[in-house]
Amino acid sequence: MKMLQNKGPLQELTLNAMAPNGIFQDEPMIQKFENHYVFKKDMKSKRNKEVKNQMNDWLAYGYLCSVHEAKKWLEEETNNEYQNLDDFVDALVNGKVLCQLAFKYYPKLASNWKPRYQISERNTVYLNAFFHFLDFIGMFTPFRFETKDLVRRFNIPKVIYCLHALSYLLDFLEVTRHVPSLYGKLRIKKSQLNTATKEISLLKKAKKFPNFPKLKNFFCSYSHRHETATSNKQVSCFREVPAWIKQCQSQCRGFLTRKCVSIEKLRRDDMSERLGWLPKLETKLSSISDEERLILLKESHQIYRKMVSLHLELLHLPQLEMSLDFCGFSSDDSSIAISSQLVPPILNNLIFKLEESPQIWILIISRFSSDGIDKIDVQNFILLILKFFGFAISASDRRSFLNLIMSCVMVSIQQSSAEVGHSTSDSLISWASRLFTKGFCLQLQSFFEKHLGNVVDKFFLEHLCETTIESDAMRVVTEMLVSCYENRERIPNELPMVLKQIYYSRSESFKPSAIKEFIEYFLCDQLMNCLSVYYSKYFEGKDSKKFTLVKHFMNSLFGRVKLNEQTEIIWHTRNYRIVEALVRKLIHLSTPKIIPVYGGRTLSCTHKDIFDLQNILRYCDERGDFSSFPSFKKLISLLGSPKLFKKHENQILLLESKNEVIHSSLPCSKSSLYQLSLSLCIPLIEGHLRNSLEEILFGVPTELENQKFMSVLRNDKLIKSIHPGSLSGISNSFVNSKHPIEQWQSRLRKILHLFSGRNEDIASLQCVLQFGSSERIHLEDIQNSHRYLCSLKKNNSQKDIHRNPLLSHVFDTNTKSFDTLKTLNYKHAILKKSMGELYKMEMIHECPRQLFGQILVVYLNRERTLLNFYLIENSKTIDEATLQLTDLIQAIKTGIYYLRMFNLPFHVKQLYTWLAPISKYDSEISFNQKKERRKTFLSFERRGKNRKF
C-alpha cells in the first residue's frame, strides 16, 4: 500500500492497465508517447539527410578529383598551365588544347589540316580534328561526347570522362601513361563541393552523369600489362625451405631410383627371353611337317601379340636404347615378313620420344645402316622423315640422314621393278613431294644437284606409264610452289632443273616441243587448283600480292629458255595466254578483309598500313568537296576498291589510243586499272589531297611533297610488282621526272578530258563531272538526245561519209543501212576486230565458225549519245591504234543512251544481248538479274575454255 501511495510513472501504468472497460483516464501520458514517436521520426529523417549529404559530398569530391587529374594530365601532355578549374574548362570549350593533343599523337592529321573557318566557328573546327583523332585511335562510342556537351556546356563531366578513357587507351597502346590518381590527396572547399553537387544532381536526374569508378576496371580487364604483383614478404616465405624437407626428398629419390632399376632389369630379362623365340620358330618352320607348322604358326601369332603388348611398356622405360635393341633383335636372324610386322609399331613408339631428344636420330641412322636397308620398306620411314625436318640438327647429321633417304629410294625402286604388278608411283611420288617441299624450305641445294638426276632416271626407266608419272610430277611441282609461297620465300633456282630432269629424260621417244607445251598448260591448271585450295590461308594481302606469285612463277619457268628468232613470237603469245588464265582465276577468288594494325609510338599511318580508298571518299564527303561531283567519286572508287571492281570487271578506262594500247582482254585491263589506281591513289594517301577539285587538278605542289612522292615510288614494292613491261611504264616516268605530282595532275586531266572531249578548263570539267556520267537516267534525257540527233541529220551531208574510207566501204557493202548511216557523223572507229579474235579474247562465248572471217565494227557519234555496230565480210589488217570493246562499254556507261544494230545475223544476236545489259545503269537492274547474268557469264567462260581451235 505504501508503494501505491507514491504515485509514479510505473504506478500510473499499472492503474491505467487495470482500468475497467479499457478506457485511459490519464490524457497527458498519451501526449508523451506521441511526442516521443514524432521525435524518433525526426531523428531518422535527419540521419538520412546527413547520409545523403555525405554521399553527395563524396561523389562531388571524387568528380573534382577526376577533373584535377585530367587537368594535370593535359598540362603534362601539352605543356600548358591553368590556375583554376574555371580556366581549364574554358580552355576545353575553346578546343585548341584538344586539337594540340590530337596533332601530337596523330601527325598525319596535322599535315593535312588547313583551317578554313570564321571566328564564331573556331571551336567546332578544333573539335572536328579531335574527333578525327578519336576515330583513328578507335575510341569506344560510350566514352565519347558530343559537340553540344562541350560548346554549350550541357555535360562537362562527360568530357572529363572521355579524357580519362583516352588516357587509359593511350596507356594500353604504350604511348603515354594514364591520368595520375589524386583521390584523398586534395583539399577542396565546401563551396566548390556545393556547386559540384548541384551540377551532378541535375545530370543524375536526366541519367547523363558518367560512372567514373567503373572506367578503370573496364580498361584494366582489357589491358595486356595488368599483372598482379606479389609482396616481398610472400616471395621470401616461398624461398625459405626447412632443412628436414631436403632430407626427405633425397630419401624418396633414392627409393624411386632403386625401384626403377629393379623393374628395368626384370623387363629386360623378360624381353630377351621372348625375343629369343623368333630364330627358334623360323628354324622349326623350315624343318617340320605341314600339320606341326600350322600349330607353330598359331603359337607365333600369340607370341606376336605378346610382343605388341610390350610396346606400351617400352614407352615408360627411362632408357630409349632398349627400343632400338628390340628393333635390332627383330631384324637379326629373322625373315622379312616377321620384321616388316614388328618394325612399324616400334617406330611409331619411337616418335613419342623424339620431341624430348632429337639426338636419337643418330642412333637410328647408325643402327639401320649397319643392319641393312633391304629388309625395311621405305613407307615405314615416312612418318619419321616428316618428323625429322621439324628439329634443329647439325649439318653433318642432316647429310647422313639425307644419304640414307636416297639409298632407301633407290632400293624401293629396284624392289618395285622386280615385283610383277606392283605400282609404287603414288606412294613414292607423294613421299618425294613432301621431301622436296621441306628440302626447298631448308635450302638444300647440294642435295638436288647430287641425287635428283639419278632418282628421276631410274624412276623413268622402270615405269613407262605416261599419265601417272606426269600427273604425280605436276603434283610435286605445285606443292613446291605453294610451300615457297607459304613461307614467303622466292621460288628456288632448282625448279627449272627439276622440270628438265622430269620431262627431258625421255627426249628420244617424244619431241621436246610437244612435251614443253604440255608442261605449261598442265602446270598452270594444277597450280591454280592448288592455289584455290590454299587461298583462304595464304593469300592474306590485297590483289597486288596475287600478281607477285604469278610474276615469280613466270620468271622461273620462262626466264632461262633460249629461243630462236622464229619461235619468239609464239612463245610470247603462249606466255601471255598462261598469264591471262592465271590472273583470270585469281581475280574471281574472294579476298578476306584485313583489319589494319596500328603500330608505332606516334600512331602515324602510311600508305603501307592503309590502302583503302573508302576512307578517302568518306573524308571527302565529310568536307563536302565531292558531293556535287558523283562521277569523280565513282572514278576513284572504281580504281581502288576491289569490292566495287567486281561489278565492273569487264570495263576499263578510256586511255590514249597512241601510246597505251592494250592487246588483251580482262587481265591486262585489270593491270592497267591498278596502274592508274596507283598513280591516282598514292598521292591522295600520302597527303597531297587538296581541299577542292580546282586545287587537285591545277594546284602547285611544294618541293617537299615532290620528294616524298618520289621516295614512295622508289621504295614501294607494290608498284614494281604490278606494272607490266608491255605498258608504257608510268612509274619510271614518275620517278625520273623532277615534278612527279604535276605529271600525276596532267594524267588526271587527260583522263577527264577523254570523258568530256572538251578543253582543259574548270568549267567544262565541272559540267562533265556533274552531268556527263551521272548514274541517273530519265526519259527527258533520252528525248533531248533524240532531238539533238534529229538536228544533226540536216547539217551532215553525204560527203562526210565518202571522205572516210571505212564508211565508204560500209556504204558499198551494205546499201540497206545507208539511209541511217549517212545522217550520222562517224568521226573515228572505236573497234574493228574479227569474230575469231573476239572469240580468242573471250569477248564472245558462242559463235559459229561461219562468222570467223567477218569483222565487227562499232561506231560512235560526236556527242557520245548513239552507238552503232555491224559485221563486214572482209579480213583486212587490224589497226592497232583502235580501242577495245571493254573501252566501248565504259564509254557507254559515261553517257550513251542508244544502241543500234545493223546487218547482224540471227545467231549473233547474243552479242547484242550480252552488250545491252551492261549498257544499262545499275539503278535499273535488280539483284536477281545480276545473279542470273553472272551464272550465264561463268557458263560461257567454261565452254569457251573447253573449246579448241
Swiss-Prot record:
It is found in: Nucleus. Keywords: Nucleus. Its main location: nucleus. SUPFAM superfamilies: Calponin-homology domain, CH-domain. The keyword Nucleus applies. One of its GO terms (molecular function) is calcium ion binding. Residues 64-170 form the Calponin-homology (CH) domain. The lineage of its organism: Eukaryota, Fungi, Dikarya, Ascomycota, Taphrinomycotina. This is Uncharacterized protein C17D1.07c. GO terms for biological process: ascospore-type prospore membrane formation. Coiled coil: none annotated. SMART domains: CH. GO terms for cellular component: nucleus; prospore membrane; prospore membrane spindle pole body attachment site.
